[in-house]
Amino acid sequence: MATIPEVPASELIQTMPRVGMGTAAFPFTSSEDTTAAMLRAIELGYRHFDTARIYATEGCVGEAVAEAVRRGLIASRADVFVTSKIWCSDLHAGRVVPAARETLRNLGMDYVDLLLVHWPVSLTPGNYDFPFPKEVILPSFDMEGVWRGMEECHRLGLARAIGVSNFSAKKLEQLLSLAAVRPAVNQVEVNPMWQQRTLREVCRREGVQLCGYSPLGAKGTPWGSAAVMDSGVLQEIAGAKGKTLAQICLRWLYEQGDVLLVKTYNEKRMKENLDIFNWELTDEERERISQLPQLRGLPGLEFISDHGPYKSVEDLWDGDV
């Protein structure tokens, strides 16, 4: 069983495994398959699981953790790190705490280790299929009111740490200026083809842990891109090193100091994704990766609307590269 390095504990967050298992899948995977994959991941050494209300996988993660305890794979729920997120339809000052309680009911847990604001966008309260109709996007996002709700989740012990997802550097700095409890994490798309240089600099300066999703570009998903897996440079580096292209990408994120989220239910790839800790990229390889052309795979077009807070992709991301 692999041992995964952890981000050291700080005043904002307890120790956090540097590699986590993601559970986002559209179309949705059956709950039985998801739960079985989570159990196998625990057997292989994964201890960090990322879920969200909108993924419809909170129950699967909770069932897998409970079954792992029953089987003796882990001693208790405390042996895993669980992240979930408040979806946009609940990103209203008075709805954050009730939404967090619903997440805990879904998980069958008393707390999550990390609770995130999923996107800096509010939708009309209700349940919508994804993608949602544009008319439910509200014209403004009450960042301060939402964050006060997140802070209350932290105060009540519903979440051991709180953070954000899909926040640009500018929005993160805006949040930091008003937060009583600082965000511990910003979870965003990160891979060699979208390196997040501006945001990473801000996160390092402010002590916010960067957590990367889609580290391989999420090829084959509605939101992903083939640019990473089709990169000739990454293929050459992988061939010369005797590693898979995926391992090159994951090692690159690891060397940046990021927490990274992988998503596969294939056991062989689960194992390969953990074989990134006992070797390094060379300076030349890092330099070649730094020169790769940049392409955002997830622009967030679903949140762009003439009557919403973001009229363009530039508005949503504030020019981050």
Curated annotation (Swiss-Prot):
The keyword Cytoplasm does not apply. GO terms for molecular function: aldose reductase (NADPH) activity. GO terms for cellular component: cytosol. Its EC number is 1.1.1.-. The record marks 85 as: Lowers pKa of active site Tyr. Expressed in roots and leaf sheaths. Substrate binds at residue 118. Pfam families: Aldo_ket_red. Belongs to the aldo/keto reductase family. This is Probable NAD(P)H-dependent oxidoreductase 1. It comes from Oryza sativa subsp. japonica. The lineage of its organism: Eukaryota, Viridiplantae, Streptophyta, Embryophyta, Tracheophyta.
